[in-house]
Amino acid sequence: MAPSTKATAAKKAVVKGTNGKKALKVRTSASFRLPKTLKLARSPKYATKAVPHYNRLDSYKVIEQPITSETAMKKVEDGNTLVFKVSLKANKYQIKKAVKELYEVDVLSVNTLVRPNGTKKAYVRLTADFDALDIANRIGYI
């Protein structure tokens, strides 16, 4: 009788399958979060751009021209500050770098404002080592 019970047990196992019943996980949240999976670093076969673009805003495009109004001259004489009309797209870091590159001076700070006519003005304060009046003479706007 033993072999038949073994056979019936085997038959039941085949009918049931080997997977058995899986306990269902109770969801307590309405949102389903994907598990964090391995994300490998990219190693492209070729660059997206064949040739990088040339510098769109070099020093000569950043600083357009010095401003020579009376108030600007007062800033040059009293405040050790140079006043320039600059590109609308230039930021303070680019203005500082351009002044340093073009006029070989150290810049203490840069203040900018966009004028009502749509141009940008920059007040470039120089360090105590440099005299704004001498630099303005060297540039040629005094």
Swiss-Prot record:
InterPro entries linked: Nucleotide-bd_a/b_plait_sf, Ribosomal_uL23-like, Ribosomal_uL23/eL15/eS24_sf, Ribosomal_uL23_CS, Ribosomal_uL23_N
GO BP term, example: translation
PROSITE patterns in UniProt: RIBOSOMAL_L23 (PS00050)
Pfam families named among the record's database cross-references: Ribosomal_L23, Ribosomal_L23eN
An example Gene Ontology CC term for this record: ribonucleoprotein complex
Annotated keywords: Ribonucleoprotein, Ribosomal protein, RNA-binding, rRNA-binding
GO function terms (MF aspect): rRNA binding; structural constituent of ribosome
Membrane-crossing segments per the record: none
Cell membrane keyword on record: no
Coiled-coil residues: none
Family: Belongs to the universal ribosomal protein uL23 family.
The protein's name: Large ribosomal subunit protein uL23
Native organism: Kluyveromyces lactis (strain ATCC 8585 / CBS 2359 / DSM 70799 / NBRC 1267 / NRRL Y-1140 / WM37)
